[in-house]
């Protein structure tokens, strides 16, 4: 694969606030690359620099061989953005929203009509083409935003938390469409706080916290390296931790306390689970390790506001 985006020692500052703190990464053409992190981690600031709507404070950022400076129209024409906010004109129909947006890319009207019809079919909104925006569900609005992002046939698609607030059915439909775009050769850049979404869609991810990259890699590899394959959750009083760790620690590759729960991480859970059965502890859960475990281990389990 060819590298399509390269960041080297990238900074973004807003006055005295450092939102992006010297990060470096590469995104390969045709992959889905995810930025994960809690609120304020620097995900959106990074995305805005890639999309040339926010200037780079320091460092270098190259997109498709060009510097990503503010208002680089050449790069903007190669990029489609699915925003987190619903930015559709409520006075227009679904079809009219797409037709109006096509003018920003100087798409000839005849070509735009054909393209709009294709995209409404792609996002399963043909039957809603003449509906006003307020007549659409939230899931339909988000699918229309996907269609809008594809009008200019972009090489790079930025999806900024594309399924926020959606029910599971709508979320899975959007995942299907994003996977289809990737199969067609698009490079996807995803920001999300849904760990399952990142596992479903991303070839590689970075986990950001306080403007820095903590880890980078394939979701499955990060889970194996940071957590193992299985997790035991034991809801038990903290004053019993020492005794329990003494009995179970040899079977685990790590442990931590969070709130009312003691977590044990292991690569082979059979021995740990046999011991737990012997101890017959109440309030115990044994499950596969997930990307959420990695995320919480690296960024902390305390509430971040």
Model feature map: region roles:
Residues 175-267:
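ABC transporter nucleotide-binding domain
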Residues 76, 120, 223, 273, ...:
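Conserved protein kinase catalytic domain
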Residues 80, 106, 145, 223-228, ...:
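A generic structural signal for secondary-structure junctions
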């Amino acid at each position: 694969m060819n590298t399509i985006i390269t960041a080297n020692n990238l900074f973004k500052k807003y006055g005295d606030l450092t939102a992006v703190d010297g990060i470096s990464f590469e995104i390969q053409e045709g992959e889905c690359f995810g930025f994960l992190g809690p609120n304020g981690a620097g995900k959106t600031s990074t995305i805005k620099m890639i999309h040339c709507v926010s200037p780079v404070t320091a460092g270098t950022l190259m997109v498709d061989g060009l510097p990503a400076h503010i208002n680089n129209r050449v790069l903007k024409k190669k990029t489609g953005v699915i925003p987190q906010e619903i930015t559709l004109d409520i006075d227009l129909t679904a079809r009219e929203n797409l037709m109006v947006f096509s003018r920003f890319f100087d798409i000839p009207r005849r070509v735009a009509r054909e393209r709009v019809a294709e995209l409404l079919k792609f996002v399963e909104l043909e039957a809603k083409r003449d509906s006003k925006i307020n007549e659409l569900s939230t899931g339909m609005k988000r699918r229309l935003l996907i269609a809008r992002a594809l009008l200019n046939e972009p090489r790079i698609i930025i999806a900024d938390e594309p399924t926020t607030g959606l029910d599971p059915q709508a979320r899975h439909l959007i995942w299907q469409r994003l996977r289809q775009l990737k199969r067609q050769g698009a490079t996807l850049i995803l920001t999300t706080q849904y760990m399952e979404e990142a596992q479903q869609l991303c070839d590689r991810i970075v986990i950001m916290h306080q403007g820095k990259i903590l880890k980078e890699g394939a979701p499955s590899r990060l889970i194996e390296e940071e957590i193992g394959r299985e997790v035991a959750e034991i809801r038990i009083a903290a004053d019993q931790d020492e005794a329990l760790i003494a009995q179970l620690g040899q079977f685990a590759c790590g442990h931590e306390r969070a709130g009312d729960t003691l977590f044990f991480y292991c690569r082979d859970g059979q021995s740990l689970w046999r011991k737990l059965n012997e101890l017959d502890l109440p309030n115990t859960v044994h499950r596969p390790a997930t990307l959420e475990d990695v995320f919480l281990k690296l960024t902390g389990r305390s509430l971040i506001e």
